[in-house]
UniProtKB/Swiss-Prot annotation:
This is ATP synthase subunit delta. Belongs to the ATPase delta chain family. Pfam families: OSCP. Its main location: membrane. It comes from the Bacteria. GO terms for cellular component: plasma membrane; proton-transporting ATP synthase complex. Keywords: ATP synthesis, Cell inner membrane, Cell membrane, CF(1), Hydrogen ion transport, Ion transport, Membrane, Transport. F-type ATPases have 2 components, F(1) - the catalytic core - and F(0) - the membrane proton channel. F(1) has five subunits: alpha(3), beta(3), gamma(1), delta(1), epsilon(1). F(0) has three main subunits: a(1), b(2) and c(10-14). The alpha and beta chains form an alternating ring which encloses part of the gamma chain. F(1) is attached to F(0) by a central stalk formed by the gamma and epsilon chains, while a peripheral stalk is formed by the delta and b chains. The gene is atpH.
């Protein structure tokens, strides 16, 4: 949803600026953990309850994560700001945008690889190596299996899609034959 992304962006950018002064990986872990907690309907219910104070919500969120960064004043201020502005539900989007900023800084990108068959370690390593050469950046792959592809893979890196699946080739042939 574009609106959520627009609202979440300043929070992600502000948190990233704070993280640049310390350990970006640790902050990334914290924001990912907070996003997981914020996805729980029970947490959102408690956070929106008039019977629970904002301070209690902040303490609940910080207690629910394992990251050592959560003990710091910056983390508490960040969560307090989200609670005060009723933005807890934005944490998953904030985490996503924080990861994008982190990847951009590292010259990396997330790669979603969908394969018709499970990829073993050597095959995946070879595929990722070739994709890194093609996209000219370090890739962080996530792999899914979708047998409807029939064969081949579909790779999504940012807004670029590389589809070498048999299903895509058949669709291309069908379009060419019916045109």
């Amino acid at each position: 949803m574009a609106e959520l992304a627009t609202i979440a962006r300043p929070y992600a950018e502000a948190l990233f600026r704070v993280a640049e002064g310390g350990d970006i990986a640790a902050w990334s872990t914290l924001v990912q953990e907070l996003a997981q907690v914020a996805r729980l309907p029970e947490v959102l219910s408690v956070a929106s309850s008039p019977k629970v104070t904002r301070t209690q919500v902040v303490e609940l969120l910080l207690a629910a994560v394992k990251s050592p960064v959560a003990a710091g004043a910056e983390a508490k201020n960040f969560v307090q700001m989200l609670v005060d502005n009723h933005r807890i539900a934005l944490l998953p989007e904030i985490a996503e945008q924080f990861e994008a900023l982190k990847n951009e800084r590292e010259g990396a990108a997330d790669a979603e690889i969908v394969s018709a068959f499970p990829l073993n370690g050597a095959d995946l390593e070879s595929l990722v190596s070739g994709l890194e050469r093609k996209f000219k950046r370090k890739l962080k792959p996530t792999v899914e299996v979708d047998s409807s592809l029939i064969g081949g893979v579909r790779v999504t890196v940012g807004d670029e899609v590389l589809d070498t699946s048999v299903r895509a080739r058949l669709a291309s042939m069908q379009a060419a034959l019916t045109a």
